[in-house]
Amino acid sequence: MSDSRLRRRQGTAGTDNKRRADGPHDISGLLDGVSVVLLDIEGTTTPITFVKDELFPYVCSHVRQHLEEHWKEEECQEDIAALRKQAKEDKEMDGVVLIPECTTKDDDEEARKKVLSAVVDNVLLNMDADRKVTALKQLQGHMWRAAYQTGKIKGEYVKLTFADVVPAIRGWLETGRQVYIYSSGSVEAQKLLFGFSTEGDLLELFSGHFDTTTGLKVETESYRRIAKTVGCDPANILFLTDVVREAKPSREAGMKTCLTVRPGNAPLTEEDWANYPVIKSFSELACDVSPTKMRSRGKAAT
């Protein structure tokens, strides 16, 4: 590298570091006109390690036990049927584990064991691939619910939210905004997480929840459905997520989008920093002006 190029790079190092830390986008007006804040969970409201290091391992280590204990229950059989159906749809995928047919009335213990083993293998394979299919998320939610009810997972075990999350949400609510959750985890799992928080039951903070039954988070149409369901123009919805593959379709649907940088999250690329507003804390989005007043102020200015 030439001396002149080196001097230019050294001269801009401070600017580059500031841009990486704060991003090139002005976030001061990000809440302008926003009536609904839509939140991702993992890596946004909640440490990514909580889900990956605590909840997911619980499912992996207890799925066989859960199936054995709840085998004759209708809900368990519905979970198995959903996984079986998904496996059939995935039959062209490498390594897919198909699940044999079997009912609770089947007296063949060997048949039951084969089904149980196939379900376990299927679940572990899908989790290893980090699949977001509804059948898997449904079973996970039911397992976590049972774990909470039996004390296998206790309330104090759930250090759910970053410290800036609840104060920011309360502030948004006070200024007339609504807050919704959109996560790959089932709605039931979402409610367990926020209902058993160390900060108490936080469910009252949310106007509603969305999961993969609405659509995959990487599909533009999913965000259009959410906007229609909440009765809000996409332009008046702000979606916060740590995943660019989710930010892109939400923006394509017309929503405002902001990426979150949290400890343990995957690093953003230079392109990500350039293309999206980025925050490290919800406190950066504090606002004391209601969306209605903000919109009327904008009309007056024109």
Swiss-Prot record:
<dbReference type="InterPro" id="IPR023214">
    <property type="entry name" value="HAD_sf"/>
</dbReference>
<keyword id="KW-0963">Cytoplasm</keyword>
<keyword id="KW-0378">Hydrolase</keyword>
<keyword id="KW-0028">Amino-acid biosynthesis</keyword>
<comment type="similarity">
    <text>Belongs to the HAD-like hydrolase superfamily. MasA/MtnC family.</text>
</comment>
<dbReference type="GO" id="GO:0000287">
    <property type="term" value="F:magnesium ion binding"/>
</dbReference>
<keyword id="KW-0539">Nucleus</keyword>
<dbReference type="InterPro" id="IPR023943">
    <property type="entry name" value="Enolase-ppase_E1"/>
</dbReference>
<dbReference type="GO" id="GO:0043874">
    <property type="term" value="F:acireductone synthase activity"/>
</dbReference>
<dbReference type="GO" id="GO:0005634">
    <property type="term" value="C:nucleus"/>
</dbReference>
<feature type="binding site">
    <location>
        <position position="42"/>
    </location>
    <ligand>
        <name>Mg(2+)</name>
    </ligand>
</feature>
<comment type="function">
    <text>Bifunctional enzyme that catalyzes the enolization of 2,3-diketo-5-methylthiopentyl-1-phosphate (DK-MTP-1-P) into the intermediate 2-hydroxy-3-keto-5-methylthiopentenyl-1-phosphate (HK-MTPenyl-1-P), which is then dephosphorylated to form the acireductone 1,2-dihydroxy-3-keto-5-methylthiopentene (DHK-MTPene).</text>
</comment>
<feature type="binding site">
    <location>
        <position position="217"/>
    </location>
    <ligand>
        <name>substrate</name>
    </ligand>
</feature>
<feature type="compositionally biased region" description="Basic and acidic residues">
    <location>
        <begin position="16"/>
        <end position="25"/>
    </location>
</feature>
<comment type="pathway">
    <text>Amino-acid biosynthesis; L-methionine biosynthesis via salvage pathway; L-methionine from S-methyl-5-thio-alpha-D-ribose 1-phosphate: step 3/6.</text>
</comment>
<dbReference type="InterPro" id="IPR036412">
    <property type="entry name" value="HAD-like_sf"/>
</dbReference>
<dbReference type="GO" id="GO:0019509">
    <property type="term" value="P:L-methionine salvage from methylthioadenosine"/>
</dbReference>
<feature type="compositionally biased region" description="Basic residues">
    <location>
        <begin position="1"/>
        <end position="10"/>
    </location>
</feature>
<feature type="region of interest" description="Disordered">
    <location>
        <begin position="1"/>
        <end position="25"/>
    </location>
</feature>
<keyword id="KW-0479">Metal-binding</keyword>
<feature type="binding site">
    <location>
        <position position="40"/>
    </location>
    <ligand>
        <name>Mg(2+)</name>
    </ligand>
</feature>
<keyword id="KW-0460">Magnesium</keyword>
<feature type="binding site">
    <location>
        <begin position="183"/>
        <end position="184"/>
    </location>
    <ligand>
        <name>substrate</name>
    </ligand>
</feature>
<feature type="binding site">
    <location>
        <position position="242"/>
    </location>
    <ligand>
        <name>Mg(2+)</name>
    </ligand>
</feature>
<keyword id="KW-0486">Methionine biosynthesis</keyword>
<comment type="subunit">
    <text>Monomer.</text>
</comment>
<protein>
    <recommendedName>
        <fullName>Enolase-phosphatase E1</fullName>
        <ecNumber>3.1.3.77</ecNumber>
    </recommendedName>
</protein>
<dbReference type="GO" id="GO:0005737">
    <property type="term" value="C:cytoplasm"/>
</dbReference>
<comment type="pathway">
    <text>Amino-acid biosynthesis; L-methionine biosynthesis via salvage pathway; L-methionine from S-methyl-5-thio-alpha-D-ribose 1-phosphate: step 4/6.</text>
</comment>
<dbReference type="InterPro" id="IPR027511">
    <property type="entry name" value="ENOPH1_eukaryotes"/>
</dbReference>
